[in-house]
Curated annotation (Swiss-Prot):
Start-end of Basic and acidic residues biased regions: 1-14, 151-163
Source species: Saguinus oedipus
Identification of the protein by name: Glucocorticoid receptor
Encoding gene, per UniProt annotation: NR3C1
Claim: Ribonucleoprotein is one of the keywords in the record: no
NR C4-type zinc finger span: 421-441, 457-481
MF terms in GO: DNA-binding transcription factor activity; nuclear glucocorticoid receptor activity; nuclear receptor activity; sequence-specific DNA binding; steroid binding; steroid hormone binding; zinc ion binding
Cellular component GO terms held in the UniProt record: centrosome; chromosome; cytoplasm; mitochondrion; nuclear speck; nucleus; spindle
Length: 777
């Protein structure tokens, strides 16, 4: 039928919207243009799918257009002759239709008296309309126009008019050419351009207080418009995923409206791939043919917690993209319904399926197939107990290009502990001179032996030798090297052993062809383990200084007091020496104390005789390097008798020409020369240790004399000297006890020595001492 338009000039209206009871809708656009035309149109529409069937009065609407949207110059408007019942948007992209009736602003009043001009404009608008309906519009602009062109039913009720009256009005206005401006067929009451959207005709009438064209039905809380485009337009939801990764929804769905007004996406059986790759403002379509393979899977229900999810609903097709290639030859593989999510090396996924949260099931509440109603589990997207990463991998170890670094703690715990130097406790570099030592101690020991340095300790020969303080005292460091068993001969012996082994290997290879020949093995191999004598050399105390001032005139009291102070320090050194003797600390602690209390005078007297023998040829008593008792000092009161007993020891050592090894063994036997009458708590072990050092004395004699008949004779002489030491020590102890008890002499005793004498006096007075002699008197 022919649509009729009644356009009458009107006065300038208030820019605000005014509702009137007149027939028709009036739109005023004169606020910006300082003029304008009031359009009063009576329209009858019966076939609009979204129109209401109830009758209501028409209301008047005044709409303001933005400033500058229409030029003030007189220009031909191709859209002014279009029927206002179309609800069609033909203006600029930013203009939105707000009512059923449409008016376009002009500078002057719009008049339809000139029929030819209006008819020509009407024909041009019809041609433009046909072209616009045939060419697909931009999804965004189409959606905006569709939403904007929807008037609210409550504010703008559906208008009814007589068809014949409308035709007569149109003929009266347009003249004879009005019949050529038919926009609809004869059986249509209105021109419906939204019939392709398949809106239900009954839906507007079910809710009388709402309009089917309300934009809030199509706009979510975040003002996201649903792209209501054609069948080939893709739909996309903007989720809360990463900024450069947007969820991709396949173009196998199109919007449909149910009776209740909800939009539904129905899966399409025939999927047509677009032939171009388009990138628009709100979404990105991957449409490269032959690159993306979309597999037909059953539709699933997936509810995601991102904005705009309610505009499409819960029904959508499962996403499965395989082999997405890029221009650089990179490949991606995604499948939400498979059990594995794999990715090639050094690739970044196009979109983010799972937000980076601990549990993926919070965003995917349910997943159910719509075809056979079978539950499809997304177990691969939810790994309990593991951290879910944004790229879909449960942990970095699942990626083929990521290798977990080895744990340093496990390597440190499982590896063998580092070997330490036996001298300074630093990390050992190997076995040097028969002992596991570091390189620094190796060089130090070699220089100390080859250079024949005479190191002296400034302290008490008990300096701490470790990695930091090993250079503080070379004397204690050298003593500790010897105590550990370092020996220059061990290196030479090792070389000899290697030479013997190589020679033996060569001879065995030459004689291996003859089975009668036997492998030549050396009869004796040098002993690499340190001997007891070598250990005794290491633990021998250093020579102590008395600190005697020779510039002051000598006196018996002064010399005796100095000797007591020196004796106290020597006793402390003797205790340390005894504890270092191999086997001594295996004895009971009480036995160790008893042996030291009985033998402390033996040790000091024998050591004094050795120093006197080595330094003064047995003519002088060398107590210390700074305190030597010569013949002049021996003439002092109470000095000669005591010095005479001590000179006997040095003279015997000089007569027998005792070697250093023999001296060390004899000194150790003097430590074990006196025991209580009741015996020791570790008596058997004591006897075994004593016999061991007696044998060591025999070995030292053999080493000095060789295999001769004089070995037994020398052994007799040395053991006879050990027995004579008991008489010498007994005389010295008697004088020491006398001076200790006689307070009138005012001779000072150090604390250590005074304690030993106090414990030893009752034992000597009671006769609770048993002398261990080698020979019977």
């Amino acid at each position: 039928m022919d649509s009729k338009e009644s356009l009458t000039p009107g006065k300038e209206e208030n820019p605000s919207s005014v509702l009137t009871q007149e027939r028709g809708n009036v739109m005023d656009f004169c606020k910006i243009l300082r003029g304008g035309a009031t359009l009063k149109v009576s329209v009858s529409s019966t076939s609009l799918a979204a129109a209401s069937q109830s009758d209501s009065k028409q209301q008047r609407l005044l709409v303001d257009f933005p400033k500058g949207s229409v030029s003030n110059a007189q220009q031909p408007d191709l859209s002014k002759a279009v029927s206002l019942s179309m609800g069609l948007y033909m203006g600029e992209t930013e203009t939105k239709v707000m009512g059923n009736d449409l008016g376009f602003p002009q500078q002057g009043q719009i008049s339809l008296s000139s029929g030819e001009t209006d008819l020509q404009l009407l024909e041009e608008s019809i041609a433009n309309l046909n072209r616009s309906t045939s060419v697909p519009e931009n999804p965004k602009s189409s959606a905006s126009s569709s939403v904007s062109a929807a008037p609210k039913e409550k504010e703008f009720p559906k208008t009814h008019s007589d068809v014949s009256s409308e035709q007569q009005n149109l003929k009266g206005q347009t003249g004879t050419n009005g019949g050529n401006a038919k926009l609809c067929t004869a059986d249509q009451s209105t021109f419906d351009i939204l019939q392709d959207l398949e809106f239900s005709s009954g839906s507007p009438g079910k809710e009388t207080n709402q309009s089917p064209w309300r934009s809030d039905l199509l706009i979510d809380e975040n003002c996201l418009l649903s792209p209501l485009a054609g069948e080939e337009d893709s739909f996309l939801l903007e989720g809360n995923s990463n900024e450069d990764c947007k969820p991709l929804i396949l173009p196998d769905t199109k919007p449909k409206i149910k009776d209740n007004g909800d939009l539904v996406l129905s899966s399409s059986s025939n999927v047509t791939l677009p032939q171009v790759k388009t990138e628009k403002e709100d979404f990105i379509e991957l449409c490269t043919p032959g690159v993306i393979k979309q597999e037909k899977l059953s539709t699933v229900y997936c509810q995601a917690s991102f904005p705009g999810a309610n505009i499409i609903g819960n029904k959508m097709s499962a996403i499965s993209i395989h082999g997405v290639s890029t221009s650089g030859g990179q490949m991606y593989h995604y499948d939400m319904n498979t059990a594995s999510l794999s990715q090639q090396q050094d690739q970044k996924p196009i979109f983010n399926v799972i937000p980076p949260i601990p549990v993926g099931s919070e965003n995917w509440n349910r997943c159910q197939g719509s075809g056979d109603d079978n539950l499809t589990s997304l177990g691969t997207l939810n790994f309990p107990g593991r951290t879910v990463f944004s790229n879909g991998y449960s942990s970095p170890s699942m990626r083929p290009d990521v290798s977990s670094p080895p744990s340093s703690s496990s390597t440190a715990t499982t590896g063998p502990p580092p070997k330490l130097c036996l001298v300074c406790s630093d990390e050992a570099s190997g076995c040097h001179y028969g002992v596991l030592t570091c390189g620094s101690c190796k060089v130090f020991f070699k220089r100390a032996v080859e250079g024949q340095h005479n190191y002296l300790c400034a302290g008490r020969n008990d300096c701490i030798i470790d990695k930091i303080r090993r250079k503080n005292c070379p004397a204690c460091r050298y003593r500790k090297c010897l105590q550990a068993g370092m020996n220059l001969e061990a290196r030479k012996t090792k070389k000899k052993i290697k030479g013997i082994q190589q020679a033996t290997t060569g001879v065995s290879q030459e004689t291996s062809e003859n089975p009668a020949n036997k492998t030549i093995v050396p009869a004796t191999l040098p002993q690499l383990t340190p001997t007891l004598v070598s250990l005794l050399e290491v633990i021998e105390p250093e020579v102590l200084y008395a600190g005697y001032d020779s510039t002051v005139p000598d006196s018996t009291w002064r010399i005796m007091t100095t000797l007591n102070m020196l004796g106290g320090r020597q006793v402390i050194a003797a205790v340390k020496w005894a504890k270092a003797i191999p086997g001594f600390r295996n004895l009971h602690l009480d036995d160790q104390m008893t042996l030291l209390q009985y033998s402390w005078m033996f040790l000091m007297a024998f050591a004094l005789g050795w120093r006197s023998y080595r330094q003064a040829s047995s003519n002088l008593l060398c107590f210390a390097p700074d305190l030597i008792i010569n013949e002049q000092r021996m003439t002092l009161p109470c000095m000669y008798d005591q010095c005479k007993h001590m000179l006997y020891v040095s003279s015997e050592l000089h007569r027998l020409q005792v070697s250093y090894e023999e001296y060390l063994c004899m000194k150790t036997l003097l430590l074990l020369s006196s025991v209580p009458k009741d015996g020791l708590k570790s008596q058997e072990l004591f006897d075994e240790i004593r016999m061991t050092y007696i044998k060591e004395l025999g070995k030292a004699i053999v080493k000095r004399e060789g295999n001769s008949s004089q070995n037994w004779q020398r052994f007799y002489q040395l053991t006879k000297l050990l027995d004579s030491m008991h008489e010498v020590v007994e005389n010295l102890l008697n004088y020491c006890f006398q001076t200790f008890l006689d307070k009138t002499m005012s001779i000072e005793f150090p604390e250590m020595l005074a304690e030993i004498i106090t414990n030893q006096l009752p034992k000597y007075s009671n006769g609770n001492i048993r002398k261990l002699l080698f020979h019977q008197k």
